[in-house]
A protein has these predicted regions:
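Bacterial N-terminal signal peptides that target proteins for export
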Residues: 1-7
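Sec-dependent N-terminal signal peptides
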Residues: 7-14
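C-terminal motif of bacterial Sec signal peptides marking the signal peptidase cleavage site
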Residues: 17-18
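Short, conserved catalytic or interaction motifs in soluble domains
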Residues: 21
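Extracellular beta-rich repeat passengers
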Residues: 24-182, 192-205, 217-321, 325-342, ...
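Catalytic metal-binding/acid-base residues of hydrolase active sites
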Residues: 188
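Conserved H-D interstitial segment of serine endopeptidase catalytic domains
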Residues: 211
Length: 444
């Protein structure tokens, strides 16, 4: 990674003028056209300094987009989030963007008068001056690694982790059906590194109550010290539930070893309002590993999580795979921060149907996964018509991409798109801000 702080000329020129360009991807010479399978709609979004604003969008699916190459036209500064200043936030000059009419939001989502995560100021619920809102973990130090209490194996009855101790996840730690793991505000949990990669897995019927506060967040982080810390130092968190997905009712989640016995790491069911607990005012740092090729643990993985579960105020930083990933389920999420994630910041698959609002994503321009990386990837199934079909709503997201951060030619070329929709997925991407991506919005 070059810095811890963190299609051609014609396309670049078109991205720099205030017009809307739709890219048509042609088949290879002598080939036949294959329809793209993503069915995303992109409305009322501000797109700034992207090489190509939209790819493979249909008329009516990309209404009220404002496209510009001038960051200074819309933002109160032109150095927010850059490697030299990663904690500076992208505040708008004005909440009103000429030519952009905000879309109505589904019931339960908060109505604000600006696109993106932040207007001219931050919504008070962001708590940007709190101990929780620490986007850049390189600036934070922890103690207690040597005296941490070891957590391993199975948790079969209710247990509480208290803030007067530190803890170390050793190997796969399962919270089994009928048990609730409660974590007090201010508690620090370290995840063991290889060969005992720490993974916390909440099984179906189990619950995690990780309810921090703005000044006493709960932190899951690396066991290493100072500059030794890096992405992939430990596994991550996995939560399994009983809500519907389109893969089945007994699916082994990614990142849990296939040898896991019993119900360990399996998700799926027919309980849309299933309750797996609460995760709020939590930070997850330096997580994300590949257990085997193509079988990765993310910062947090959600398998079939139901709508009664509470997800809010979560920051994932310096991740070795995706920040957050959903496989099916219907849980909603609000106030999410993502920094220096190797693969996708948010990944949704297998029939996920929740609503996500208030997301701030800041990329590391020098780090991207070889599988091609986006701020948001939405897929459903390789089998068209699988039910349920992924159909999330994403609103008030600000994604800060690599072109803005370091300029053309300087960033990792595996960065692809701000919001990418494929594999028979539907989505509504509305009232958002996308800055500095090779492609801002794309179906493929």
């Amino acid at each position: 990674m070059k810095s811890n702080q963190f299609l051609g000329i014609a396309g670049m020129v078109l991205a720099m003028i205030a017009c809307h360009k739709v890219e048509i991807i042609r088949p290879p010479e002598g080939g036949t056209s294959t329809p793209f399978s993503g069915k995303g709609t992109f409305k009322s979004n501000l797109l700034v300094q992207n090489r190509i604003p939209t790819s493979n969008t249909s008329p009516g699916d990309d209404e009220s987009l404002v496209v510009s190459g001038d960051v200074g036209q819309y933002f109160s500064s032109t150095d927010f989030g850059k490697p030299s200043n990663p904690t500076k936030l992208p505040f708008l000059k004005s909440n009103t963007i000429a030519g952009l009419s905000l879309q109505p939001l589904p019931a339960g989502m908060k109505v604000v008068d600006y696109p993106g995560a932040f207007g001219v100021t931050a919504d008070p619920e962001w708590n940007i001056t709190s101990n929780w809102f620490k986007i850049n973990p390189y600036e934070i130090t922890y103690t207690g690694q040597a005296t941490a209490e070891i957590l391993q194996g199975n948790i079969n009855s209710n247990r509480t982790l208290t803030a007067d101790k530190t803890y170390l996840l050793r190997g796969q730690v399962f919270v089994n059906s009928g048990a609730t793991l409660t974590i007090e505000p201010g508690t620090i949990i370290f995840g063991d590194s290889k060969p005992n990669d720490g993974i916390l897995c909440i099984n179906r019927g189990g619950k995690l109550i990780a309810k921090g506060t703005p000044e006493k967040p709960i932190v899951f982080t690396s066991p290493k010290l100072g500059t030794q810390r890096q992405r992939g130092d430990w596994g991550g968190i996995v939560v399994c539930g009983k809500a519907p997905n389109n893969k089945g009712t007994d699916v082994l989640v990614e990142g849990i070893e296939a040898g896991a016995t019993g119900d360990g790491g399996k998700y799926g069911g027919n309980v849309p309002n299933d309750n797996s607990g609460e995760i709020s005012y939590v930070r997850v740092e330096y997580a994300g590993i590949a257990v085997t090729p193509g079988n990765e643990v993310n910062g947090i993985t959600f398998g079939s999580i139901g709508s009664a579960t509470q997800l809010n105020h979560i920051i994932v930083s310096v991740g070795g795979d995706d920040g957050l990933e959903w496989f099916g389920g219907s849980v909603n999420a609000r106030f999410i921060g993502l920094y220096d994630i190797l693969d996708d910041d948010l990944d949704m698959d297998a029939g996920y149907t929740g609503n996500i609002q208030f997301v701030y994503s800041l990329r590391n321009p020098y780090a991207a996964d070889v599988s091609l990386t986006g701020s948001l990837e939405i897929t459903s199934s390789k089998t068209a018509g699988s039910s349920p079909q992924s159909a999330p709503v994403i609103a008030n997201m600000t994604s800060v991409g690599p072109i803005y951060l370091v300029g053309e030619g300087a960033f990792n070329p595996n960065h692809e798109g701000g919001c990418r929709v494929s594999a028979d997925a539907r989505s509504q991407f509305i009232n958002n801000v996308v800055i500095g991506w090779p492609r801002a919005l794309m179906n493929f």
